[in-house]
Design a protein with these regions (language model features):
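Internal acidic/polar
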Residues: 1-23
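DNA-recognition helix of helix-turn-helix
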Residues: 30, 41, 55-56, 60-86
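Short helix-coil-helix linker/hinge
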Residues: 24, 34-42
Length: 90
């Protein structure tokens, strides 16, 4: 990004700035995606990938089998990938 090159003299490492901007944009896109999916799917996804909860623990908390949790996570990841591709993030 040419605009970020203007910050080269006052910030350490331009790549760091670009990574920060890209990370922020990606975070915003993921948040939009999560807002658009069912609450149950969102909760399971956040527990697994934000709080790093084991599948077994998530299954117990939500009264689901571990295979059901794994399937739900796989489908949500697929939906997220499609969403990020549509948004031009991938």
């Amino acid at each position: 990004m040419l605009v970020l090159e203007e910050l080269d003299e006052c910030l350490p490492g331009r790549n760091h700035v670009e990574e920060e901007v890209e990370g922020k944009l990606l975070t915003e896109a993921i948040n939009r995606f999560l807002e658009g999916i069912p609450e149950h799917s969102r909760n399971v996804f956040v527990r697994r990938y934000w709080y790093l909860s084991p599948v077994k623990e998530i299954a117990q908390e939500y009264g689901m089998g571990q295979s059901h949790v794994k399937m739900l996570l796989m489908r949500t990841r697929q939906q997220l990938k499609q969403y990020l591709e549509k948004e031009g993030m991938l």
